[in-house]
Amino acid sequence: MRECRSQEASGQLTFAKTPRTVGIEEEFHLVDLTTRRLATRAPELLPLLPDGYVAELQSCVVETNGSVVSTLPELRADLTARRRVLVDTAATLGLGVVAAGAVPLSVPSEMRVTQTSRYQQMLADYQLLAREQLICGTQIHVGIDDPDESVLVAGRVAAYVPTLLALSASSPFWSDGSDTGYSSVRTLVWQRWPTTGLAPPATSAAEYDALISDLIATGVITDAGMSYFDVRPALRTPTLELRVCDSCPRADTIVLIAALFRALVEREIEGLRAGVPAAIVVPPLGRAALWRAARSGLEGDLVDLIHPASRPAGDVVTDLVQMLRPQLEASRDWQTVEELARRALAEGSSAARQRRAMRMRNSLLDVVDHLIAETADVATVANDALPTQRNGSDRG
């Protein structure tokens, strides 16, 4: 990776490696613009879209596969450009697009699993789990070339993953219109699959691969693609993949989470190479922390897994951002992340914003309209919030 010079706040000139690459996969609900209900029309929409848009398990969902980028301005530009194409194309069919963990209006009898052999086999094998998979998530990929490091870092970042989930929380309502009391009901639905949750305690790529082979041998999953751990080495690219997050109505939320995850990966690789012990997350505590993040979002307490205790979400998020300041400054992301984190805490999670929309007129239609509007809005952050890179950077 190329080194480039940067000027820190102290005035000292330092050298920083080119930031690790980032890529995003976003899942989007399709809704009928007349009824605001989920619409199983992805098979009609996808042929109208360019490459990079694909089907998902449910035919009311479309996924985008983003470009590989190195800077946050590039990332945001890619996210918003792909959203604009999807939103504009869907509108020609009378469809709205929603980036959120769940949408509060649907007719269960109208929902359809996508007609591919893989998805139909999943329906046959998992039944209710597949039928109720009316949820959308965001997957964030960060480049790691070494497979062994990828496996080890997946475990080392575990203590901070619940905080990233809380930042993304965008599913307070279930598809029957009920307020679940959670900020991310998607998490509860998702965790029913047999291979979700914390990354397994593997110490090498070979050990991780052996575990996946054993899971396939049990017949519980059919292939490695069904290893749905919260953080996992990606299957087809040299990246580490964060899978815990809800889909996010605001692209800026994804930019924030991606920047924090990239900084976490960098911090833990530095620690691994320096022999710094990893923070050990005991599975029951890790699961409790994920549950609490799904319950509270940014509006209640979160579990601090470093010193196990319940603490206000704002304090946990602020501490994470401050902890990662050296890595964020090295990648020239500090100013952007500090501003986006401040705004996230001031304005609340998407779940809280949806509940505010609901309280205005007690209307779920208003909630869906709010989500459609936020998803389509590509100008929510002033230009100076994502400063232009002064130094060019190589993709690594």
Curated annotation (Swiss-Prot):
Keywords: ATP-binding, Ligase, Nucleotide-binding. One of its GO terms (biological process) is modified amino acid biosynthetic process. It catalyses: L-cysteine + L-glutamate + ATP = gamma-L-glutamyl-L-cysteine + ADP + phosphate + H(+). GO terms for molecular function: ATP binding; glutamate-cysteine ligase activity. Pfam families: GCS2. It is an enzyme of class 6 (ligase). InterPro entries: GCL_type2/YbdK_subfam (IPR050141), GCS2 (IPR006336), Gln_synth/guanido_kin_cat_dom (IPR014746), YbdK (IPR011793). Its EC number is 6.3.2.2. ATP-dependent carboxylate-amine ligase which exhibits weak glutamate--cysteine ligase activity. Belongs to the glutamate--cysteine ligase type 2 family. YbdK subfamily. This is Putative glutamate--cysteine ligase 2-2. It comes from Mycolicibacterium smegmatis (strain ATCC 700084 / mc(2)155) (Mycobacterium smegmatis).
